[in-house]
C-alpha cells in the first residue's frame, strides 16, 4: 500500500520502500510511478490516465522520500529547483570503515557504463565523465564483531549522478554496508543487516526526528 506523506492538487510526497523502482519498471516488478498513478486515479475526480512527473530518483535497494508532480507545469517547476540545487537531498547510510574526519566533501568525476549499468570514478577530462559532489557527515560509530568498524553517515548530495553515493563512498574506501554492486565484501548477495548496523540506523532516525521536532515542517530527501 502506498505510504503518502503529503499530497495536494499539484504534487505527491510518498515513501519508497527498498526493492521497488522509483520510476516505471521495464519488467513485471512493482514500481513507484505505477503505484502513484493508481493512487491518483482512485482519489482524483479527473477523467483519464493521471499524469505522474518523476522529479528525482532513488536506487532500487534504497528507501526514502520521493516527490512526484501531478501536472507538467509543477514537474517543470520542481525539476528547475533540482537543477538550480534549491532542493536538498540528504540520506542516511551505513558505511564500512571510518572517515578520517567528521565532515568531508568529496568531488569526483563519474562515468556510466550503460552495458553493465554501473558507474566508476575516472580522471577529470575523461570523455563522458560528469562531475559529482557530496558531503559526508558522521552521525555515529559502532564496532561489529564480524564486519569491523561501521559508520552511520548523513550524505548530502550536491549533484545527482548514477549510483553517485554508492560509487563515491566505495571509491574513497567507505563502501555502503550491504551494497552487492560496489562493496567487494558482499559480492551481490542479500544479507541481513547486523544488529550493530541496525542500531546505528535506528539511532540516526531518532536523532533526525528529535532535530526536527518543534520546528517548521520539513521534507528531507
Task: Name every feature range the model reports, one short phrase each.
Residues 1-221:
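RNA pseudouridine synthases
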Amino acid at each position: 500500500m502506498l505510504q503518502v506523506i503529503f499530497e495536494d492538487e499539484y504534487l505527491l510526497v510518498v515513501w519508497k520502500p527498498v526493492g521497488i523502482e522509483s520510476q516505471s519498471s521495464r519488467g513485471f516488478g512493482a514500481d513507484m510511478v505505477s503505484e502513484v498513478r493508481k493512487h491518483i486515479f482512485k482519489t482524483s475526480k479527473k477523467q483519464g490516465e493521471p499524469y505522474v512527473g518523476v522529479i528525482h530518483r532513488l536506487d532500487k535497494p534504497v528507501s526514502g522520500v520521493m516527490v512526484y508532480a501531478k501536472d507538467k507545469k509543477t514537474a517543470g517547476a520542481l525539476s528547475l529547483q533540482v537543477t538550480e540545487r534549491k532542493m536538498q537531498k540528504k540520506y542516511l547510510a551505513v558505511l564500512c570503515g571510518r572517515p578520517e574526519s567528521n565532515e568531508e566533501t568529496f568531488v569526483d568525476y563519474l562515468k556510466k557504463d550503460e552495458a553493465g549499468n554501473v558507474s566508476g570514478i575516472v580522471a577529470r577530462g575523461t570523455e563522458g565523465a560528469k562531475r559529482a559532489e557530496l558531503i559526508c557527515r558522521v552521525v555515529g560509530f559502532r564496532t561489529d564483531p564480524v564486519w569491523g568498524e561501521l559508520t552511520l553517515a548523513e550524505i548530502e548530495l550536491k549533484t545527482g549522478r548514477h549510483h553517485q553515493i554508492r560509487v563515491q563512498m566505495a571509491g574513497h574506501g567507505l563502501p555502503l554496508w550491504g551494497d552487492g554492486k560496489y562493496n567487494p565484501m558482499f559480492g551481490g548477495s542479500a544479507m541481513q543487516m547486523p544488529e550493530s548496523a541496525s542500531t546505528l540506523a535506528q539511532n540516526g532516525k531518532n536523532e533526525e526526528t528529535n532535530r526536527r521536532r518543534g520546528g517548521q515542517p520539513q521534507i528531507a530527501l
